[in-house]
Design a protein with these regions (language model features):
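Short, intrinsically disordered terminal segments enriched in charged and Pro/Gly residues
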Residues: 1-8, 58-110
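Short Cys/His-rich "knuckle" micro-motifs
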Residues: 26-30, 56-59
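Conserved short hydrophobic patches within well-ordered secondary structure
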Residues: 20, 30-31, 52-53
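Short cysteine-rich clusters marking metal-coordination/redox-active sites
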Residues: 17-20, 46
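Short, flexible, mixed-charge glycine/proline-rich loop motifs
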Residues: 2-14, 35-40
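Short metal-binding segments enriched for Cys and/or His
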Residues: 42-64
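Ordered hydrophobic segments in well-structured contexts
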Residues: 4, 30-32, 41-46, 71, ...
């Protein structure tokens, strides 16, 4: 039997993003996945990684979460514009040098 669910809770304590490894601070909203697929599992993804994954379709076409897909995407982005900024944000764990969070990536206006 396979079961999974997703929610967007507000962090009450610090968590670690399973995609970029950055700290999800208390008060931040994040994606939390839970499932049972032979074994029980949980998945936490910061709002930045979730937005980038959805905007730039970073997936293998399945339901699997794989940080290697993000690494491949970020290292393969060329040119300029919002996608390059998002890749740079991911590579810096969505933090500026001073420690402030980058803005959450947004889909470019058509």
């Amino acid at each position: 039997m396979t079961f999974w669910s997703h929610s967007h809770p507000r962090a009450r304590k610090a968590h670690r993003c399973d995609m970029c490894s950055r700290r999800i601070d208390p008060g931040e909203t994040y994606l939390r996945g839970t499932g049972l697929d032979g074994t029980a599992w949980t998945w936490k993804e910061c709002a930045h990684c979730e937005a980038a994954r959805l905007i730039y379709d970073i997936s293998d076409g399945g339901e699997e979460y794989d940080p290697d897909l993000f690494d491949g995407w970020a290292s393969g982005v060329r040119g300029a514009g919002p996608e390059l900024r998002a890749a740079a944000g991911y590579q810096s764990r969505w933090r500026t040098q001073s420690g402030a969070l980058w803005p959450i990536p947004m889909r470019a206006a058509a």
